[in-house]
């Protein structure tokens, strides 16, 4: 545990991640819950009990007893059954030891001062914690067992304690505890953290952006863990056609259950995807459960993506390993299906980079080849196509994507056109255009939905043969 990325590997993320919300939901580390707001003692008393009607295991709490650290206050807290740990945390006395050992010292002093104190008259169940602190070691062991085999550097600890216990503890501590006494939840979290650090000294407890989130139910002693995903940024080249960017569920069974005959039980319309060609080697290397793929746009299944590649962020879920060298991962990915997909520029990143990649709109360069019947003179074709350079297109939502795109007219600029080549009935050219341009429709017009188009300027029906993304102009 703790064999993780160095501090230089990842910069601290200040936004774009929702883990910090736990800090306001009583799931922070000890530092996040040590701040005790001033309380009106009279209001606190009136909230939940009615003076002398409150009893604790037959031992009436004397609400008129002085608060700690007065000797009579400490003696009274002992009489009502405070355990050594709670005695120390609300006693307000400095000792050489803390926790149970510190409380035992205070108890010993109190018994030496007051011979009337008797262990036999003291309740066995602590009214301040219901003996929760006896389970600290057990809880720490459960956390370690649950996370066995998982490498992590930081942890966020969340504690759930029954409301009625918190209320009763707060009333007793507010009335009889020393000023500034730490509340139960803070002290319980601190005790668990101290025990964890005693067993695993190379981890840090944090209030936000942890590698691992742990929640403890104080009622059942149940421990739940949530391993935070890791994110890796890079660019991919798709060298073969017929591969979707992400997993495509089977059209017949929608990927439900064990699939169907149509997908041969895979649940997928296409057996391969850029997501899995890249993600499977990473998932296996990090011993993770699954991946999610976030690309800067996407190309059609029959379109290649060349040049420096398309930026993407791969999200790796529930990784047991978090410190793999990106260069090593890059090598594993590129040896997986080198004739189909390659990656470059891999580096670890943060969750905020997902939205940055998905929201970035970059100009793109393409090369497209199409076929026409009865072509006009070559010079006329070249001049007509070059004449579209700088034009702003009006593109209605294409028929082929109308099921997943809003019906509206989009304006997109053709930045430049170059390298027009005419080879009998086949024509090829390169262009650079605004993000979101439907390039195939620029050529064949989609039955007039794109204006102007190559079809309209050469007055011939156009059949697109292939399209390649040559470059995505993103920093």
Where are these regions (language model features)?
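Non-catalytic RNA-recognition surface used by pseudouridine synthases
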Residues: 6-475
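Short, Lys/Arg-enriched N-terminal segments with co-localized hydrophobic residues
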Residues: 1-4
């Amino acid at each position: 545990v703790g064999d993780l990325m160095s501090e230089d590997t990842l910069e601290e993320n200040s936004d774009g991640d929702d883990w910090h919300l736990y800090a306001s939901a009583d799931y922070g580390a000890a530092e996040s819950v040590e701040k005790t707001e001033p309380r009106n003692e009279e209001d606190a008393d009136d909230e939940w009990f009615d003076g002398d009607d409150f009893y604790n295991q037959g031992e009436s709490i004397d609400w008129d007893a002085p608060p700690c650290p007065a000797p009579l206050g400490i003696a009274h807290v002992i009489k009502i059954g405070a355990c050594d740990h709670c005695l120390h945390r609300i006693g307000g006395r400095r000792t050489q030891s803390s926790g149970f050992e510190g409380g035992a010292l205070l108890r010993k002093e109190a018994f030496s001062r007051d011979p009337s104190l008797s262990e036999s008259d003291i309740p066995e169940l602590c009214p301040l914690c219901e003996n929760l602190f006896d389970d600290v070691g057990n809880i720490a062991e459960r956390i370690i067992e649950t996370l066995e085999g998982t490498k992590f550097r930081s942890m966020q600890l969340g504690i759930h304690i029954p409301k009625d216990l918190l209320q009763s503890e707060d009333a007793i501590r507010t009335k009889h505890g020393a000023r500034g006494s730490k509340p139960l939840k803070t002290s319980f979290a601190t005790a668990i953290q101290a025990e964890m650090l005693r067993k695993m000294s190379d981890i840090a407890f944090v209030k936000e952006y942890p590698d691992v989130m742990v929640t403890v139910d104080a009622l059942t002693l149940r421990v739940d863990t949530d391993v935070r995903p890791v994110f890796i940024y890079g660019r991919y080249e798709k060298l073969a056609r017929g591969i979707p960017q992400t997993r495509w569920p089977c059209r017949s069974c929608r990927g439900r259950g064990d699939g169907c005959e149509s997908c041969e039980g895979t649940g997928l319309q296409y057996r391969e995807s850029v997501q899995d060609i890249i993600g499977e080697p990473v998932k296996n290397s990090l011993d993770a459960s699954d991946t999610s793929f976030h690309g800067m746009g996407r190309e059609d299944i029959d379109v290649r993506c060349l040049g420096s590649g398309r930026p993407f962020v791969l999200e790796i879920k529930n990784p047991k390993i978090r410190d793999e060298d990106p260069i090593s991962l890059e090598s594993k990915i590129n040896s997986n299906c080198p004739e189909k997909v390659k990656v470059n520029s891999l580096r670890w990143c943060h969750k905020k980079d997902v939205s940055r990649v998905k929201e970035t709109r970059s100009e793109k360069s393409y090369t497209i080849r199409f076929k026409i019947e009865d072509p006009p003179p070559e010079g006329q074709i070249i001049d007509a196509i070059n004449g579209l350079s700088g034009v702003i297109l009006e593109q209605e939502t294409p028929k082929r994507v109308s099921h997943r795109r809003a019906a509206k007219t989009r304006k997109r600029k053709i930045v430049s056109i170059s390298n027009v080549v005419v080879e009998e009935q086949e024509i090829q050219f390169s262009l650079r255009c605004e993000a979101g341009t439907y390039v195939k429709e620029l050529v064949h017009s989609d039955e007039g939905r794109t204006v102007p188009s190559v079809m309209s300027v050469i007055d011939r029906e156009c059949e697109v043969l292939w399209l390649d993304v040559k470059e995505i102009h993103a920093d």
